[in-house]
Amino acid sequence: MEKVVCIGCGVTIQTEDKTGLGYAPPASLTKENVICQRCFRLKNYNEIQDVSLTDDDFLNILHGIGETDSLVVKIVDIFDFNGSWINGLQRLVGGNPILLVGNKADILPKSLKRERLIQWMKREAKELGLKPVDVFLVSAGRGQGIREVIDAIEHYRNGKDVYVVGCTNVGKSTFINRIIKEVSGEEDIITTSQFPGTTLDAIEIPLDDGSSLYDTPGIINNHQMAHYVNKKDLKILSPKKELKPRTFQLNDQQTLYFGGLARFDYVSGERSPFICYMPNELMIHRTKLENADALYEKHAGELLTPPGKDEMDEFPELVAHTFTIKDKKTDIVFSGLGWVTVHDADKKVTAYAPKGVHVFVRRSLI
């Protein structure tokens, strides 16, 4: 097939991957002028859609930003803070200032104080090598906190261009669409622009002083659980409502299964509470450690679901990660799934996740 390009952004048209760059429905190829799905949504509905990107593509974009004099706005999913992190961002974007914005704040328990969460984000960012000029919490879906971020962008950009970066599924496009609505009402002000030095298109939103805000394509972090489930199950892993913590008083040698996606063994220590922050729709099953392997072997895909029976053949094996908990209130985090808060110190636990999914400890978020 001869190469067809989108008349909106110049990207090469493809009809296979709906989430990929340059996707257009096969039927559209019969038209004289072909427009990709991303530009179509942009033009007709004033909506920005995320597209998938390879690591190399994404690094090219970040290096390109490093060669500009601009403000960078980094969006993370506060429910999956570490899983939606972009490593090395500070180095890659050069000396440009960075605003850190935690999205989906509305799904965390309302009892969590906003100020405490922002301080936690600052500490975590520092440990991960990022020194943001400011930190914000928003709910892009509900429009909460957006005006505050707009004011900060105006303050810090000083007439410069603004680049919004983030992984897929962090709500980056929803965030930008909220900004557009807040600033301009319903006007169709978006144009598309080739990103300097790459073949990838960034979305350009002209600002009133001659500079622009750019939406850059998102990157998939392969260590997140979302990478290993189908679209139906992905909805379960993307909570829309406030998380309801579930507490289990466990004796040692007891196990929790989170559907069939992950497992938590309390290996040794005194009887203690373990608080699970997982999507509300995800069933949690308790069993004895000595029965845990047999339970999974017999019931994975049925009692222990998601994934369903049909997906089990392709679902990666669960890999063990053992931790000795030395501090009170420590989180065991399953990247892209949730976390278990270990309330007391001096515990030995083992966490199982699909091969490739990151599991790690951190100081308690809540």
UniProtKB/Swiss-Prot annotation:
SUPFAM superfamilies: P-loop containing nucleoside triphosphate hydrolases (SSF52540). Binds GTP and GDP. This is Uncharacterized protein YqeH. CDD domains: YqeH. GO terms for molecular function: GTP binding. Signal peptide: none annotated. Estimated to be present at 2000 copies per cell. It comes from the Bacteria. Residues 59-222 form the CP-type G domain. The gene is yqeH. Keywords: GTP-binding, Nucleotide-binding. Pfam families: MMR_HSR1 (PF01926), YqeH-like_C (PF21516). InterPro entries: G_CP_dom, GTP-bd, GTP-bd_ribosome_bgen_YqeH, Mito_lipid_metab_GTPase, NOA1/YqeH-like_C, P-loop_NTPase. One of its GO terms (biological process) is negative regulation of DNA-templated DNA replication initiation. Transmembrane segments: none annotated.
